[in-house]
Amino acid sequence: MAVKKLFGTSGIRGKINSEVTCELALNVGKSLACYLGNEGTVVLGYDTRTTNVMLDQAICAGLLESGVDVIKIGMVPTPLVGYATDKLGADAGVMLTASHNPSQYNGIKIWNANGMAYTSAQEAKIEEIYSNESYTSVSWDKVGSLRVNEEIKGRYIDDLVGMVNIKPGLKVVIDCASGAGSEISPLVFRKAGCEVTTLNSQPDGFFPGRNPEPNAENLQNLMKTVVAIGADLGIAHDGDADRMITIDENGDISPFDSLLALMSKEFDGDIVTTVDAGLCMDESVKGNVLRTKVGDVNVAEVIIEKDAAFGGEPSGTWLHPDFCMCPDGILSGLRMAELVSNKGKLSELLLEIPSYPNIREKIICSKEAKTAVMENMEDLLKDSFDDIKEINSIDGVRLTFNDDSWVLVRPSGTEDYIRITLESKDSTKAQAIKETCVKIIKENI
């Protein structure tokens, strides 16, 4: 039987009741249990999406039926699932979330015992078990047990606060998108000594205040609020709070690459990032910059392999190996608050980071068409540009030009898009590169 592809760059994700169903969740639970040897313990959490009520029951049933114990920790941020899996000595963790996707989406992400997301090799094993239906039920006396753990939230909060030293009174506005960080993130910042104003901090899976994707279009209210109350910093989370984006004291959204470079400067040692990160990383950090495929698990793997000090994606997904191998938007926000508290205004700190014209574009492309479009992308791009210095095909196709301009064309692993990311010290050239790439993609869809 052909193996069904379930996982993208960030777990399983799709539209509810068409791509992601209770049957799928049940059988993923059984498949995970089989992978674990029909024994052990799994931590289970979920974000604020309304459809998590049914998915939670379904995947839990699959795990229990197959002999695995389940620890439910309820509605929590994704990083708390990674943290709990590690601290409670579980064999795996499961988070039900579609992160920044709209309300009609949901998904499943699986975590290792150390709090790191499942690797692509592990996900492939789950897909093989799922596709072949090679999972089995256990006898009645070997069915897994279910318990609820509410104490781990408090432990997580205390450990987060202990990671930073923020001067009392820093004014912070936190926009949680009505997502999984709504309860914990503001509480953590208050316990850390900040004066906190909240936006969209009532959990609601319909995301009534704003779309959970933390970008400039969706953060207009946060930008205005930071200026209106004279705050030092704005923090925006996505739907499950594994990401964080900042607004400076002037109400401006921080450039994603520059923000990552600013935090990376604080660490000695090597830094891991992805192929879509900009030149400012290489020009700012103390150690080596190691690039890998997009996706937090890819960053985590290289952090472990190279014993790196810190890692992250320009999207605001940052990993702090001194805390947990799960990306943590709340800790990322705390560390930015600590930086502003001790070193000055965010806008001025960002001026220290080199900044060049950077363009991010996305072209709608169905899942079925993405593979075909990307098949010949390297040749199409090579035929369209004549000053190429280097080609990197670790994740999509990245061209670096003789003047260090670069462009990355890659299929989204979570949505129906092909993404273009590019950077050049010459804004005219940046625009020309973008137009050429858009034309190539549209002509081949």
From Swiss-Prot:
Q: Which GO terms describe its biological process?
A: carbohydrate metabolic process
Q: Which residues bind Mg(2+)?
A: S99, D238, D240, D242
Phosphoserine sites (modified residues): S99
Report the domain of life of the source organism: Archaea
| Record key words, sorted | Isomerase, Magnesium, Metal-binding, Phosphoprotein
What EC numbers are recorded for this enzyme?
A: 5.4.2.10
Question: Which residue positions are annotated as catalytic?
Answer: S99 (phosphoserine intermediate)
**Which cofactor(s) are needed, names only?**
Mg(2+)
GO function term, MF aspect, one: phosphoglucosamine mutase activity
Q: What's its catalytic activity? A: alpha-D-glucosamine 1-phosphate = D-glucosamine 6-phosphate
| SUPFAM superfamilies assigned | Phosphoglucomutase, C-terminal domain, Phosphoglucomutase, first 3 domains
User: What Pfam families does its record include?
Assistant: PGM_PMM_I (PF02878), PGM_PMM_II (PF02879), PGM_PMM_III (PF02880), PGM_PMM_IV (PF00408)
Query: How does the cofactor bind to this protein, according to its record?
Result: Binds 1 Mg(2+) ion per subunit.
> EC top class, in one word?
isomerase
- Output the PTM entry: Activated by phosphorylation.
Query: Which NCBIfam families does this chain map to?
Result: Arch_GlmM (TIGR03990)
What family classification does the UniProt entry report for this protein?
Belongs to the phosphohexose mutase family.
Q: What does this protein do?
A: Catalyzes the conversion of glucosamine-6-phosphate to glucosamine-1-phosphate.
What's the protein called, per UniProt?
Answer: Probable phosphoglucosamine mutase
- Which organism does this sequence originate in? Methanobrevibacter smithii (strain ATCC 35061 / DSM 861 / OCM 144 / PS)
* Lineage summary: Archaea, Methanobacteriati, Methanobacteriota, Methanomada group, Methanobacteria
